Every structure is written in structure tokens, then in C-alpha cells.
Amino acid sequence: NSSTQNVGDIAVDWKSGTIWVGTGENNSSRSSYAGIGILKSTDKGKTWTNVGLLDSHHIGRILINPNNPDEVIVGSIGHLYSSNKERGVFKTTDGGKTWKKTLFIDENTGIIDIQPVPNNFNILYAAAWERESKAWNVDGDGKNSAIYKSTDAGNTWTKISDNNGFPNGKGVGRIGLAVYDENTVYAFHDNQFRRKKDSTKSAKGSGALTKEELASISVDEFLNMKDKKLNSYLKMNGLQEKYRAENVKQIIRSSPGEMRPSDLVGYLKDANAALFDTPVIGAEVFKTTDGGKTWKKTHEGHLDDLYYSYGYYFGEIRVDPQDQNGIYVLGVPILKSKDGGKTFTSISKENVHADHQALWVNPKKQGHLIDGNDGGLNISYDDGESWIKLNEPAVGQFYTVYADNQENYKVYGGMQDNGVWVGNHNAKIDKSWHQTGKNPYESLMGGDGMQVAVDDRNPNIVYTGYQFGNYYRI
């Protein structure tokens, strides 16, 4: 019953039934909302108490010492849109009555992840993240993004990612951590440095759209181009978040005789020149086998189609507790590796939503996974070869709800990454549609579903859209 719906992390002491909740989302998107500090329940969630860190705004991680439930470590990311001091690593040894800041980098750098060594809470690894958001841009990298290590349960920290194989400098982005043992650690890095020109794979000869082709084709050829081909081109150049084939084509349609596909090259280039010509390196996995003394990239080449240009929205990695070479990385798809990150395969399936945010790997049964994504929850018992969709929890995030003015009115909802849906006002959801295939709600559009308006003169005309101002009449 607290005055927030935004959660960054949860930690539970199962023996005592004590639950710790770090409020404020840890994904630094434009729609990521601040929280109200740390909440604690000592009666399995019946009642809650705020135990401080109110100005942290966004919590990256909470860890409970399994041998002392009053000892808790918190990673605070800090404000998203401004600088502040209540960020870094905080520790309590009295159940949240008092807090001590044990690691502080600066007012723009917080802690996005902390992971303990299994069975040794004294050794902790933490990921610092320098980031700042504006209404018009997310800056998700900085020279203070780095990896730290503690050998005294979080009381003191040492940076372990300087000039030892891990990237340094202004292009270091969000980092996720997975710890197998005290020496073996994986780091999942959103590398925002630009790719070298000669390292960007050429699309020539592959049937993919090129800048040269785009500059020479006619308007009719462009409008008849398959959306998949154009969307692949936009993704390859890091523009997937802002542009889709539909709205790029609409730009051409809306200016007959005035704008050609060749103009689009310059238009997109001006919109984001650096990303257009030299995409960022993007997602990459590093590994240490000596407790952070040295780091080495696990794979050759780029992990394309995993992060695109918005790695600040992801950053989670897991290692199989029974197999140090079994790792999982989460992005738009979910990938797994069985050879320590040398090669990866996608385990995203047709009934699994994109954009993966959380993953539980059963420490006692290999192949048993629970995946949390922007479409809800999925469970697998065969290491991601097949998934069951858990569609019962009401976990949708609505941006808007709208009702038209008919007597037998319809209700519309725009949802985060689940599009726009409509149903009759008296529609009831039960499990019968699993048998009949007739869901009382209908999807009108994908993406981030936004505002809806219905023409009062003709309720069959609906105006709606998705993120970045892309609106349509249906």
C-alpha cells in the first residue's frame, strides 16, 4: 500500500519472511519512474515500513547476507534526470535503522548491479554506471562506468577494470554481472564506443538494403519495399528505436513530388549522423578467471540484433550455477552460450515476447528457467528450447485508458511495449478463450501503445499511435 508502483529490485530472507524492496525502476528509459527509497516487510508483505534512502530515486540491486538478515547491501543508481549524492553502495547492519555509504564515485554515477560470490558474502562485485537522461536524449555511458570489488562484505571497494582488458573511457555503458565463483565472473557490457569502419560488416551481396540503393531507387520502388527489409536497415544503423518502416514510408507519402528516398538518406543522417554511419559496438561479454585482475572478451565480432542502440534498457546476464560455461544474456532476444561466451544461440521463441528484463536459473535443476520480459513471464524446462507462457499475472503497464461515447461503449488501452487493445466495456476475461481462440480484446497496434481518440461521428474511425509521435487513423 505504499505510494509507488515502481520497483528496481527485491530481496527476500525466506527463513524470517522478511522482504526488502528497492523502489524506482532500474532501466533508464524515458518512461522509467522514480521510487521512494527502501521498503521493508517483516510479515511476508502484509505491512511495510520505509527504511530510508528516499532520495536514491532508482535502486539497482539489493543483497541480504544469508548468514545475517540484518546486514543488507544496496546499489543506488540515483536520479535519472539530475545529479544527486544519494547514489552508490549503501550498507546497513541493523536492519535498515541506519545506513552507511561505502562507495561513492560522483553525483552522476551510481551502482546498477552488485553480485556476491556464492557461499562467500565477503566477496562482492559491483558495476558502476554513469548515465544521464534528458527529455530528448538518454546518455547511457561515461568514463566513470566501471567494475569494483569488495573482499570485506561491502565495507571497502577497489576498482578492478582499469587497463586490464576491460574497456575504459567515455564510451563505457551499462554493465551487468554474473558470478560463478570468487575468480570466475562474467561482465555484460553496453559498449557505446563507435565501431571502426572496417569492423562493420558490409551488407552488400546479402540482399540487404544499402545506403547506395536507398539513394537511387524510385518512390514507387521504395513504397513497395517490404517493411522487413527497411526495418532491418534501420536496425543495422542503430535507428530502430526512433524509426519504423511504416512511419518512414509515411514521410515520403506525405510529401508527394517534394521528397524522394534519396532525400531520406540525408534526413536520417542529420537525425543521428554518428549512429547512421558508424554504429556503436553494442553488447559484448567479458570474463575474468582471476578475480578481476584481468578481463578478456569471450567472443569475436559483434553481438548484433541484441541491444541495437538502447542497451541502457537491458544489461542482465546469468551464469548456470552448475556450469561455469553456461551463460544467458538478455536483450531484445535472449541468447545462451554453452561454451563460456564464445558462441551464442537465440532461445527466443514465437510465444516469448521481446525485451528481456529478468531471468531465474534453477540452481538445482539444469535447464529450468523463468524469464521475465516486456510481455510477462515464460517458463522453460529444456534450457529454452520451448517455453510455456504464464499469462495469469496482471503485469501490464498502461500508458492510457480511453472509452468512446457509444451507448454500448468500447474501452481502449495503450500499453508499454504491448500495443493498443480494445474490447467491449462489459468484456470478461476467463480461460475459455484458450479453448475457443476468441479473446474478447483485440490488438490494434504494436509497440508502446499511446493515446487513443475515437471519432464521435463515426466510432469506426480510431486515432492512435506508438512511441515517438507515430500516429495513425484506423
Where are each of the predicted segments found?
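Beta-propeller blade termini and top-face loops
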Residues: 1-474
